[in-house]
Swiss-Prot record:
<feature type="transmembrane region" description="Helical">
    <location>
        <begin position="301"/>
        <end position="321"/>
    </location>
</feature>
<feature type="transmembrane region" description="Helical">
    <location>
        <begin position="267"/>
        <end position="287"/>
    </location>
</feature>
<dbReference type="GO" id="GO:0055085">
    <property type="term" value="P:transmembrane transport"/>
</dbReference>
<dbReference type="GO" id="GO:0005886">
    <property type="term" value="C:plasma membrane"/>
</dbReference>
<feature type="transmembrane region" description="Helical">
    <location>
        <begin position="123"/>
        <end position="143"/>
    </location>
</feature>
<comment type="subunit">
    <text>The complex is composed of six subunits: RsxA, RsxB, RsxC, RsxD, RsxE and RsxG.</text>
</comment>
<feature type="transmembrane region" description="Helical">
    <location>
        <begin position="322"/>
        <end position="342"/>
    </location>
</feature>
<keyword id="KW-0285">Flavoprotein</keyword>
<keyword id="KW-0812">Transmembrane</keyword>
<feature type="modified residue" description="FMN phosphoryl threonine">
    <location>
        <position position="187"/>
    </location>
</feature>
<comment type="similarity">
    <text>Belongs to the NqrB/RnfD family.</text>
</comment>
<dbReference type="InterPro" id="IPR004338">
    <property type="entry name" value="NqrB/RnfD"/>
</dbReference>
<feature type="transmembrane region" description="Helical">
    <location>
        <begin position="89"/>
        <end position="109"/>
    </location>
</feature>
<dbReference type="InterPro" id="IPR011303">
    <property type="entry name" value="RnfD_bac"/>
</dbReference>
<keyword id="KW-0813">Transport</keyword>
<keyword id="KW-0597">Phosphoprotein</keyword>
<feature type="transmembrane region" description="Helical">
    <location>
        <begin position="20"/>
        <end position="40"/>
    </location>
</feature>
Amino acid sequence: MVFRIASSPYTHNQRQTSRIMLLVLLAAVPGIAAQLCFFGWGTLVQILLASVSALLAEALVLKLRKQSVAATLKDNSALLTGLLLAVSIPPLAPWWMVVLGTVFAVIIAKQLYGGLGQNPFNPAMIGYVVLLISFPVQMTSWLPPHEIAVNIPGFIDAIQVIFSGHTASGGDMNTLRLGIDGISQATPLDTFKTSVRAGHSVEEIMQYPIYSGMLAGAGWQWVNLAWLAGGVWLLWQKAIRWHIPLSFLVTLALCATLGWLFSPDTLAAPQIHLLSGATMLGAFFILTDPVTASTTNRGRLIFGALAGLLVWLIRSFGGYPDGVAFAVLLANITVPLIDYYTRPRVYGHRKG
């Protein structure tokens, strides 16, 4: 009789994986609630579309590979992938975009590598980057937060815009994106980058409606604080470790502070970097993915710091206003190298 030796890991704990994924899904509730509050019902519709698409895509691949569909879907990883992608895209993006991004994330970025535990890149961020590169206009068409919006779509209008491109009264995305100053709005990070390139001073930019009276932009600072609250709860539940979020946020804050001190007229202040865009979502929910992050404590600190540095560089000097997704994927590439040089020394072995 011939015994085959399978590749590691040799022990699997389906219940533990399912529990951690469920905790992460529960921790996302404050962030989702904040996005619903400031950006409307479109976020919920996108989550539903992404969740159904993720489950169907994963079930299809598992069926083709003749693996147990029910047992694998119970680990909740497909749901989490769909959720993370859905909250990362504009709430009123066309329905086919979130479906396309989710299917690509699950089938190409996850199952093509062998499924959960085998993928080297974060599937949700792969899906996001594919959409961003392919459809940059739709992926950057965020609504203004309700506090500065002229037109606030209801639940029915949100569904109609997502599936047809227009509200019941005939309004389109250009109408819905108008702010109280009559100007089409963008995210705080996008507004800052575009305005600096147009020659506006930071002092002028901070007087815009999206920044006026705010630390880091209307709506967005509260969304980030909500994701932070969910992340702290994950730490308390010991579902994630502190190394990656802390090193990521400290590095981002340090780089932003130094940059702002040296060039206050062209670079954003640290609070804008920390409380705008996908900062807290990335720190606690994306970078901490146990499959694609470093596996040693020292490695996690390096991994988080590298991602923080990359986010600041992309936001400050790159072509995209946020940069979290690109930073995550670039950091994922370095994980084997980081783990190799930070692996703990075996007891009894002398140092190289």
